[in-house]
Amino acid sequence: MTTATTVKTEYEAIIGLETHCQLSTKTKIFSNSSTAFGADPNTNIDPVCMGLPGVLPVLNEKVLEYAVKTGLALNCQIARYSKFDRKQYFYPDLPKNYQISQYDLPIAEHGWLEIELVDAEGNPSRKRIGITRLHMEEDAGKLVHAGSDRLSGSSYSLVDYNRAGIPLVEIVSEPDLRSGLEAAEYAEELRRIVRYLGVSDGNMQEGSLRCDVNISVRPVGRKEFGTKVEIKNMNSFSAIQRAIDYEIERQIAAIEAGDRIIQETRLWEEGAQRTSSMRVKEGSSDYRYFPEPDLAPIEVSNEQLENWRSELPELPAQKRHHYESELGLSAYDARVLTEDRSIAEYFETAIASGANPKAAANWITQDIAAHLNKQKLTITQIELTPTNLAEIITRIETGKISNAQAKEKLPDLLSGISPEKAFAGLELITDPTVLEPIVDEVIAANPKELEKYRNGNTNLKGFFVGQVLKKTAKRADPKLTNELVEKKLNA
């Protein structure tokens, strides 16, 4: 894991994240237009998301379900009664000149999630980060600036309204984060959770997960917050960490130089690896919120709440704790296995089929992971079933095949060949009466090496073991072979 940039000890950073997460519904939040990514510009639009006169929004019930499930997964209090509000501002990507959002009565609030940081020795430490609120809203359109990645410097701008009306939840953290590393881990854990829930794909490159950072610095020991600066335009977790680390140093340098920190929005410039001023930050009063008159208040019944709660899967943090405390896995292995729900399910199916948990973890996080990375595949795309992986591990542990044989046959196994077929005729020779004559034959055939060994070159033991394995096409049991070779050489 990336380590954090060292911050001068006389200052501390106060960091909070506002995360916009697109929900994976088939249609938009208030209309029936598709939410599919990558469509031609302005093809997934309709009168509602374009704000044409005379049309009325209707809430997509799936959006409410996904928002409540996310709130429950984040340990939030779910509001039995909430409402939508109009957030008013004027920008080309907002066709109605207002955004339907939630203001004073969000669907969920007062939650938390736990982040886990692993040090260089592999020891985990955990920290609880508060969640202020989670609310539903509609996304805006997307501006494309010709000749620049921002309005300034572009010759003209185009607007794609396909994104307008796509459902979002905005998740606002408490200012409990203290470094770029903590913030990046918080965002990663948030993505793991929404992916486990199946409510979002969390794809930062496609804009499904967008994080804005609020950051200030203050002298250690001071209770008052410094002036808050917002940072936008970070499209990866590493960019979040680098942007925060840069901004911490920038603000500290400004304070020490006697400059005033102004409340503003700054843009992270990936190429230059710096933040630059974008606009003076607006306050909430600038948006002139008022209740949305075209949508009825939202009521969540006890039955809905309990049904949705019962459908929650075991979440990443719960799985990590289970893997470490009950299965004896390392913090690193538990983290890798729970990074993706399909990998965790593959692992759990393998151990349910009889695989040793540590052996299964090693195979999945090492050999299988290497294959997935090389071929750019997911674990659901390989033909090696978790049941067959369990059988392979059992064959190794019972001495029927060696670990080396299994690794050699892994490409065949990954392509769908069964363990029975892959290891046919390759069972290990474990009978000493069969293996001993072969060892005698190898030693007799190499008198010069035998003499060198007995004159002190004990490293040649590996040579004799290798010759036995070669002569038996690697079918000789490695442990038994080592024992017999050592016994014969020292006779």
UniProtKB/Swiss-Prot annotation:
Keywords (A to Z) from UniProt: ATP-binding, Ligase, Nucleotide-binding, Protein biosynthesis
Gene3D superfamilies in the cross-refs: 1.10.10.410, GatB domain, N-terminal subdomain (1.10.150.380)
Similarity-based family: Belongs to the GatB/GatE family. GatB subfamily.
EC numbers for this chain: 6.3.5.-
Identification of the protein by name: Aspartyl/glutamyl-tRNA(Asn/Gln) amidotransferase subunit B
Lineage, top ranks: Bacteria, Bacillati, Cyanobacteriota, Cyanophyceae, Nostocales
Signal sequence range: none
Disulfide bonds: none
NCBIfam families: gatB, PRK05477.1-2, PRK05477.1-4
Organism: Nostoc punctiforme (strain ATCC 29133 / PCC 73102)
Described function: Allows the formation of correctly charged Asn-tRNA(Asn) or Gln-tRNA(Gln) through the transamidation of misacylated Asp-tRNA(Asn) or Glu-tRNA(Gln) in organisms which lack either or both of asparaginyl-tRNA or glutaminyl-tRNA synthetases. The reaction takes place in the presence of glutamine and ATP through an activated phospho-Asp-tRNA(Asn) or phospho-Glu-tRNA(Gln).
UniProt-recorded Gene Ontology molecular function terms: asparaginyl-tRNA synthase (glutamine-hydrolyzing) activity; ATP binding; glutaminyl-tRNA synthase (glutamine-hydrolyzing) activity
Organism domain of life: Bacteria
HAMAP family linked: GatB
